[in-house]
Regions:
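Short acidic, glycine/serine/threonine-rich loops at helix termini
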Residues: 40-42, 66-69, 176-184, 247, ...
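Acidic, metal-coordinating catalytic segment for phosphate/diphosphate chemistry
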Residues: 5, 40, 338-339, 343-444
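Long, highly charged, low-complexity intrinsically disordered interaction regions
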Residues: 150-208
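Catalytic palm subdomain of template-directed nucleic-acid polymerases
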Residues: 134-155, 228
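Short Gly/Ser/Thr- and Asp/Glu-enriched loop/turn motifs at secondary-structure junctions
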Residues: 127-131, 171-174, 317-321, 369-373
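DNA-contacting surface of Y-family translesion DNA polymerases
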Residues: 30, 212, 222-368
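Residues that scaffold, gate, or flank divalent-cation-dependent active/transport sites
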Residues: 2-129, 133, 259-261
Length: 444
């Protein structure tokens, strides 16, 4: 069946009365915890986030530090959520809250527990620390509620037990629930957006900008604009004329773009729960607070590799491929350096991995341009039991290194991550001690 024919059939169904989100349709709720980090900080202080100017940021880093969150009260003043500290007008007085990532994770876990009182974990997909999707299709009849009433029930429970305000989107698929929350909920008094395929086309086919829509970035928006396409309706109509040029431009991603233009989403909650990636990886990355020289950045690469190896060892995993990514000060307009090195066989040996990453760094890094971002990634990770050791491996040396790694891990688990350090971790350029006290690159 063509897209056009499918659209015409659904249009006829709606004419016969099938256009609303009803009990016999899939019903997805997408819930977002409003200005989550900032709201948590307000709750902890007994303040109202809708009446309090509060910023979650670490001003000790620099005045260019990006705010992790601001309260709705500050958004109402026209201040952007992900602004930098120096971009906040001097006339605006506000409270600065240092990030407390562990606290936010604790709140998020508590809220997840609230959801579990109403639905099974198999019907919840945690999208981020402050956002989740819930398939309530099989619960509406049980609770004698509509999908919107179910959303209200969950939002009220979160508010009553944590003090955190939420917004929600209700849709007939994952995509529509997300869009209902991201776009529609902002313009309704109860902060609950509702969409099905038909109301989506009626309400949002002319919506601008395209970058407001999930998974459409500024580059895609700009590329489409070059062809006179500025709305989802434009994409849908273009797909009716000819899909080929969209596939030539975006490859396989064109299928998702076209589906979303029509309000379709083939991925279901069960697909997410049953998905298992064929390849797994572990990574460690950080943004540096100033330009690092070639030698200083090598210290950081070693520290990150140390932590990555220990993570592999602790989880009983090995890697057979390592990738290093280096980005430079944007003022130099220097393209990022990236390289990958393969190991002879899967390993979590500190020496083998460190040697491989160091050599890769020496090969790809620019020695004369300030370095600002680094990421080390262990690719193709697999359980250690799958590894076949070579006849050329030295069993005594291997055992010695494993015993050392095990001892280091035990000490760190018992006394803290900074209990054992290399001498280089005490250098002024080192970020090792500070990073070990963070969660996700921010203060715990």
């Amino acid at each position: 069946m063509t897209v056009k024919m499918g659209y015409m059939l659904q249009k006829e169904e709606r004419r016969m009365g099938g256009g609303n989100v009803s009990q016999d349709q899939t019903s997805i709720i997408c819930i977002d915890l409003k200005s989550f980090y900032a709201s948590v900080e307000c709750v902890e202080r007994g303040l109202n986030p809708f009446k309090t100017n509060l910023v979650v940021a670490d001003p000790t880093r620099s005045k260019s530090t990006i705010c992790l969150a601001i309260t709705p009260a500050m958004k109402a003043l026209g201040i952007k959520n992900r602004c930098r500290i120096h971009e906040i007008p001097d006339c605006v007085k506000y409270i600065t809250a240092m990030p407390r990532m562990q606290l936010y994770m604790d709140y998020s876990a508590k809220i997840y527990g609230i959801y579990l009182r109403y639905v099974s974990k198999e019907d919840i997909h945690v999208y981020s620390v402050d956002e989740c999707f819930i398939d309530v299709t099989n619960y509406l009849q049980l609770y004698h509620l509509t999908a919107k009433e179910m959303a209200v029930k969950l939002m009220q429970a979160v508010m009553e037990e944590t003090g955190i305000t939420a917004t929600a989107g209700v849709g007939t698929n994952l995509y529509l629930a997300k869009i209902a929350m991201d776009i529609v909920a902002k313009h309704v008094d109860d902060h609950i957006g509702i969409l099905d395929e038909f109301s989506y086309r009626e309400q949002l086919w002319d919506h601008k900008p395209l970058s407001d829509f999930w998974r459409i970035g500024s580059r895609t928006e700009k590329k489409l604009a070059g062809y006179g396409i500025h709305t989802m309706g434009d994409i849908a109509m273009a797909s009716l004329r000819s899909e080929d040029w969209l596939y030539k431009m975006f490859g396989i991603d064109a299928e998702l773009l076209i589906d979303h233009a029509w309000g379709y989403e083939t991925c279901r909650m069960s697909d997410i729960k049953n998905y298992h990636s064929e390849e797994h990886s572990l990574s460690n990355g950080q943004v540096l607070m100033r330009n690092y020289s070639f030698d200083e950045a090598l210290v950081i690469v070693r520290e990150m590799t140390d932590n990555l190896v220990l993570d592999l060892f602790e989880k009983g995993l090995v890697t057979s491929s390592l990738t290093l990514w280096i980005a430079y000060d944007h003022r130099y307009e220097h393209e990022a350096s990236k390289g990958t090195v393969k190991l002879e066989r899967g390993s979590n040996s500190s020496k083998k991995i460190m040697d491989a990453v160091e050599n890769l760094y020496l090969r790809i890094a620019d020695r004369y341009t300030g370095i600002r971002r680094i990421e080390v990634c262990a690719n193709r990770v697999a359980p250690e039991s799958y590894v076949q050791y070579s006849l050329f491996d030295d069993p005594k040396q291997t055992d010695k290194e494993r015993h050392l790694q095990e001892a280091v891990l035990n000490v760190k688990q018992r006394y803290g991550k900074n209990a054992i350090m290399r001498g280089s971790n005490l250098l002024e350029c080192s970020t090792y001690r500070e990073r070990n006290e963070q969660i996700g690159g921010h203060r715990a």
